[in-house]
Amino acid sequence: RQAVKPQVAMYEQFGIPGMMAFKKTVDYCREKGLVVIGDIKRGDIGSTSEAYAVGHLGKVQVGTKEYAGFDEDFATVNPYLGSDGVNPFADVCKEQKKGLFILVKTSNPSSGEFQDRIIDGRPLYEHVGEKVAQWGAECMGDEYSYIGAVVGATYPEMGKVLRKIMPKSY
């Protein structure tokens, strides 16, 4: 199947009408049989992270009715706040059979300011890759995890290292 990745910020800048357009975009793409990756890059903790996860990937109960918010198939998540920020998303993914793409090594020019920092002899992105593999081990599909990684194609050598660290992640 083919996938699309609408960037939510391009819709958010237009306020409520923009968010309504985002929902229409997601619904239209799903009607066409496309996999929808919500490029939301959320990162928060506790109940806030859970609310983002439910709003984009899960269902919320209101009285006797259940609603799916934006209803993407996958969402992008920023892991900077650690497991407190990722676990609520992973829980919703397990429950709803949805997925995540966690930022590991991004392609933007300044990504190395943090992602390439050496910690315990290895770059930070390798440590993040290990956490993605751990989180992913708890969310396995047939062969691959529902938890994947964002790894910029502009860094093929780093990609090879990360593939070894995360062999079951897309």
Regions found by a protein language model. Give the residues of each.
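Short coil/turn connectors at secondary-structure junctions
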Residues: 1, 6, 31-34, 70-72, ...
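Conserved, mostly hydrophobic/aromatic
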Residues: 4, 39, 75
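Glycine-rich, proline-tolerant flexible connector loops at the mouths of alpha/beta enzymes
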Residues: 5-19
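Alpha-helix-loop-beta-strand connector modules within alpha/beta enzyme cores
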Residues: 16-38, 164-165
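Domain-level signal for soluble alpha/beta catalytic cores
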Residues: 27-41, 46, 70, 149
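Conserved anion-binding
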Residues: 44-148
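A C-terminal functional module that forms or caps the active site or interfaces directly
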Residues: 153-170
